[in-house]
Amino acid sequence: MIAGGETMKRGLRAQAFLPLIVFLLTTTSCTTEKKAERAAPPEQVKASVNWEKVVTLSKTTPTLQVVVNPPLRRGHLTRPLAPSKIHDPVFKALHDLGADFVRYVPWLPYPKLGVAELEPPANGKTSWDFSLIDPMTEDFINATSGHSVVLNFSTIPQWMFKTQKPVPYPADPDQVTWDYEQGTEFRDPSLKEVADYYARLVSWYTKGGFVDEYGHRHESGHHYKIAWWEVLNEVESEHRMTPQTYTRVYDAIVQAVHAVDPQIKFVGMALASEPPDYFEYFLNHQNHKPGIPIDMISYHFYAVPTPDQTQETMQYTYWDQAERFLAVVDYIQAIRSRLSPETQTDTDELGSISGDDLEQDKPGHVTKPIPDSYWTLCGALYAYLYSELAKRGVEVAGESQLVGYPTQYPSVSMVDWNTGQPNARFWVLKLLHDNFGPGDKLVEARVDTPYVYAQAFVTTQGQRKLLLVNKRDRAFEVTIPDSQGSEIRYVDQTTNFQPPGEARLNGNQLTLSGFEVAVVNLSR
């Protein structure tokens, strides 16, 4: 999760980027023959596939995260504003995507939308209140019905931490605050208080309600099936937990939640960075209470250029940082294989952030326009990461995030925050989801330039497909042997806010425009 204020400054060690203001001059035909209309001729490259050489079997699900924020509300309950214009189209897009392992995160900038007990129990009374939390949660669960989800109520009630004075929060649920999370020491060192809080949350959504601290029953009527529960978020930044502290908190919460629903599986850590000591400590079963499962771990990656980079150099930075991240993934997978090989991996925040977003907490900041080419670049980066994570045996590749908007990381959004229309980042995810998934065979593919990425798949239905990703803001003409007449689905700067385009190859060449992602179906 991308944090703000003091938390933002801590959480953006590797989460900064300048917006791409590169207006691409490529257009691509959506007719039967796909062409690039550039002044300069495209570079000629060749792709080859060895269908007999299987590299690995994919375990990887392409998916996304949904972060709670006001535009996702059905309407504004506390002040006379019009209902959200994007609520319906956004949840429809989520429903139509049909992805598994979708991550849902109520989090710190909006305490009233993410914390169910904002005040400590006192004098026989509690402050439990789901009236603002339930509508979005219900809409999310309905939109993802029939699919596995990962719930993460990531923000612990602030009063559970020792602070010099109580930490305030806005009366307006739509008012952002970056200062809610403070303190590093729990007021209850036994951790029973925080564990009971999460047990009651789970009981609210799975058992129809719960009994509070004073023995009073609170009825919800909810009996949802929750497949996965992620325990907190970016804990090395939020409350600055050590691996030892987090492991104790994880164990306490897992034990309490399992008492409510023994079928729930758990995701641990959700790290913003990749500190080796966290993985070494947390994945060692000897550091956990007996019987505590480590079903899955999670961590995040956001591409980050330095502030002084020019617009032209940013496209190179993205891919360089992705390569470094993948090297870290290899290292983490080696630790996991050594200490807890049964544990799965969820990279549940994969994204990129513009440099302008880093200024959003400053008074009077106005979000700069984001060019369409930025969304296609981000989509291409995600497609590349998905494929490479599949090679490495990572189970979940989650794109971040469904809705961002001014004050809440607009450059990370997968939709237009004014209309709810999905952008190229969403449509690339849709393209991958509709063509690839767990059980596919990854087979050897090559292309004679480092600037175009190729990976071949034999799907579970036996179809032969080639994923192509253009890493550069220029066109390449890719020769693919025996591809004449093949169907193509693609996302580029001409499709951008529309569903993937469709075409058919008239010959063995495909012109790949700047930052384009294409899937060529070579099954005939």
What residues fall within each predicted segment?
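Glycoside hydrolase catalytic-domain groove-lining segments
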Residues: 304-361
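Bacterial N-terminal signal peptides that target proteins for export
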Residues: 8-17
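Catalytic-core regions of glycoside hydrolase
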Residues: 260, 279-296, 324-339
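Histidine-centered active-site microenvironments of extracellular/periplasmic hydrolases
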Residues: 365-368, 372
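Short, Lys/Arg-enriched N-terminal segments with co-localized hydrophobic residues
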Residues: 1-7
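Bacterial N-terminal signal peptides
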Residues: 17-27
